[in-house]
């Protein structure tokens, strides 16, 4: 598909998409990895929400992989501390299957494996918004499920726990990152009201990539 440029800049296009999202969906949360794209997305969404919907709280979902960059965890710590009274925070530290190339014998590694606590590479974060095996409210979670499934099932649980109303997970995905992401956004079989950057996951659960055309 040939790119077609318009006279609108990506920031104004993002604002337009946010108006659409907040109008169409009852429950909104941001998937925040602690990386630059999801960090930019989170701050842009919060700025929009504070300006146009000051009485509405959004959710922030962080999927902790235990063995991740120290500066990433530090950034997540600072961000969550700043948002503690401004957003619904979900810092998920549950056992999940992640593919590994570090072993010749095992296909998966399990962050936060509750039967191997002595092998954890860092201590469990200690905050009231941290979700682990001792306090897990996510009813759609299955023990040691794949990491991708955990993220999807969190979205489903978020809808269930918020009155089963229409829910959207905002992603910092950019089409420019790779051909796979480019085609994944532009060639979606099922969009939402003609918008290719929104995709259906489950009944009344969607994902949206409002920064998809950012460079």
PLM feature spans:
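Nucleotide-activated chemistry modules centered on ATP-dependent adenylation/adenylyltransferase
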Residues: 1-31, 36-215
């Amino acid at each position: 598909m040939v790119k077609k440029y318009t006279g609108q800049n990506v920031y104004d296009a993002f604002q337009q998409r946010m108006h659409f999202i907040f109008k169409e969906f009852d429950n909104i949360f941001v998937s925040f990895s602690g990386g630059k794209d999801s960090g930019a997305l989170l701050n842009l969404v919060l700025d929009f929400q504070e300006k146009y919907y000051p009485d509405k709280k959004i959710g922030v979902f962080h999927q902790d992989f235990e063995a991740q960059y120290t500066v990433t965890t530090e950034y997540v710590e600072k961000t969550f501390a700043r948002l503690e009274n401004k957003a619904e925070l979900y810092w998920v530290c549950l056992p999940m299957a992640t593919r590994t190339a570090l072993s010749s014998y095992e296909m998966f590694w399990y962050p936060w494996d509750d039967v191997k606590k002595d092998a954890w590479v860092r201590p469990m974060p200690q905050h009231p918004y941290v979700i682990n095996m001792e306090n897990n409210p996510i009813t759609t979670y299955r023990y040691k499920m794949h990491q991708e499934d955990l993220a999807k099932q969190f979205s489903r649980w978020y809808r269930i726990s918020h009155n089963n109303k229409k829910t959207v997970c905002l992603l910092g995905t950019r089409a420019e990152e790779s051909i796979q992401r480019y085609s994944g956004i532009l060639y979606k079989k099922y969009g939402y009201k003609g918008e290719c950057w929104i995709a259906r996951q489950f009944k009344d659960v969607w994902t949206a990539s409002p920064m998809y055309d950012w460079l």
